[in-house]
Amino acid sequence: MLRTCDITHIKNNYEAIIWKGERNCSTISTKYPNSAIFYKKRFIMLTPELGFAHSYNQQVKPLYTFCEKQRHLKNRKPLTILPSLTRKLQEMKFLPASDKSFESQYTEFLESFKILYREPLFLQIDGFIKDFRKWIKGEFNDFGDTRKIQLEPFQKNILIHVIFFIAVTKLPALANRVINYLTHVFDIEFVNESTLNTLKQKTNVFLVPRRHGKTWFIVPIISFLLKNIEGISIGYVAHQKHVSHFVMKEVEFKCRRMFPEKTITCLDNVITIDHQNIKSTALFASCYNTHSIRGQSFNLLIVDESHFIKKDAFSTILGFLPQASTKILFISSTNSGNHSTSFLMKLNNSPFEMLSVVSYVCEDHAHMLNERGNATACSCYRLHKPKFISINAEVKKTANLFLEGAFIHEIMGGATCNVINDVLITEQGQTEFEFFRYSTINKNLIPFLGKDLYVYLDPAYTGNRRASGTGIAAIGTYLDQYIVYGMEHYFLESLMTSSDTAIAECAAHMILSILDLHPFFTEVKIIIEGNSNQASAVKIACIIKENITANKSIQVTFFHTPDQNQIAQPFYLLGKEKKLAVEFFISNFNSGNIKASQELISFTIKITYDPVEYALEQIRNIHQISVNNYITYSAKKQACSDDLIIAIIMAIYVCSGNSSASFREI
């Protein structure tokens, strides 16, 4: 006979032993931070790492995030602390708390925190994440192949949606704690509360182009859920019987190969993994036999190729919506040429943000794929393409030869777009360019800045301010980004002045001012456009060099182009590369790779006018012109010229290219 207290003691010891190998051991410090506090109770907060502290520490985001992240790390590496900080910390003295009850409160609080790490369902979720991490690292591959698996963004999104919902429904009492843990595991601390609520909602729709690994990714999700989450019930519905049968056999094969120690059965389209006290099941059905899913209590229902599911079967699937513990994932490709097979796109207007669309073209530029013969990507180029996907002009031509419109409808993804919108510059890009500027005289930033200054000069020999002026732009690099150091939009005061001298002095004045503020530049590379007047371009180059070398000891080189006699001259002839330069600029601008310096130099733009805002006005005017299937770009509008923006675009384009051999001294 055992006494009750002995039974409890033995049970606790037994559980501690059997969980020892699997448990994600808590790294919470058990040492009581004994420090006195001198403020009211309502201002006190209690955390495992800080003990009793003032509640304003919750607003110190780096501190609070660091504490939470360290709390969830299993094997923490020793932290490296600067010696000066160590000395300062050692000098700090804390008075011990006089109230002994604080220590008992802290101990009780710590025990409540450790409940999560002892919760069996938490250990199951953690086991699922560990197995998935091993699979990504290639540890489950056959024949010694240890190559890592690279997940696409939409696949990561599906994984997070699945595990977040299961965590919330399986552990409702500890939902906030486990969600906090998962945000650290998946490294998504930056997401806000609204996004977290989206991850936890019951229904989500993923529309992804064909051949991108939708069905392939479902197999490991089902396999690892069956292995780790005890008692889970999964449903899988496909548009064809052979698809559901194939997925079922793949799941069975992977489970038997990866988990040979588990008891696995496959009978009547149901795969079962037998745990000690309960079974985990996955049922596979086609839309022609939805009777098998009626009356089930799924935790996860995956509807593959949802756009091609019979409408009668959809009624049965939607019957699971009222079930609070069921997550429904609609995953499908899109035939956007047919509204009957793209009806899920209507959810784009849903207030619940349940629709995620993967496409190679945004709605603003979908029409351009038809207008441009060889175009195969969105003109804003915010694109992530897997390495196993090849989309080029030949693929487009071949697809459209078989079936008119097949390229845009079957391959590119997205929805039928009847709205034509020629907006090339995104609002996000404009906002980032206007407000996020680097301080290029910051000593911590200087080591990462490029040591070459590129200056593009587009001269205009007219005094008509309504026509055009001289655009000058100075560009440098910061890692893979481009920084605007200076810009000028110069108009001749009158035709009586020497236009060559005035333009050259304006450019030299800007360059010298930039060099005064940024002495780290070792070379100035100047590009003078010679399309209007080659002789004047050569004269401008000579005057600029004379002005700079008289004031600064720095190497000055000019872009050289062979003339009719094959003699290299210091000017640049702008040709068809202007189109490529504009597209390169648009892609980098929209991706946030073009920034302005806080110490930007400009003498010709009014003091009351921010030069960056002045440049933005011209950037917003960039538009596409299509004439006889030939595409070009312009930023000219009725009351606005494009001289400055063309200079910026070309300076960035030349800076990005491998054109060092074309720069020579004169």
From Swiss-Prot:
A motif (Walker A motif) lies at residues 208-215. Keywords: DNA-binding, Host nucleus, Hydrolase, Viral genome packaging, Viral release from host cell. The active site is at 305 (for atpase activity), 458 (for nuclease activity), 529 (for nuclease activity), 643 (for nuclease activity). GO terms for cellular component: host cell nucleus. It is an enzyme of class 3 (hydrolase). A motif (Walker B motif) lies at residues 300-305. InterPro entries: DNA_pack_C, DNA_pack_C_sf, DNA_pack_N, HSV_TRM3, P-loop_NTPase. One of its GO terms (molecular function) is hydrolase activity. Its EC number is 3.1.-.-. Belongs to the herpesviridae TRM3 protein family. Component of the molecular motor that translocates viral genomic DNA in empty capsid during DNA packaging. Forms a tripartite terminase complex together with TRM1 and TRM2 in the host cytoplasm. Once the complex reaches the host nucleus, it interacts with the capsid portal vertex. This portal forms a ring in which genomic DNA is translocated into the capsid. TRM3 carries an RNase H-like nuclease activity that plays an important role for the cleavage of concatemeric viral DNA into unit length genomes. This is Tripartite terminase subunit 3. It comes from Human herpesvirus 6B (strain Z29).
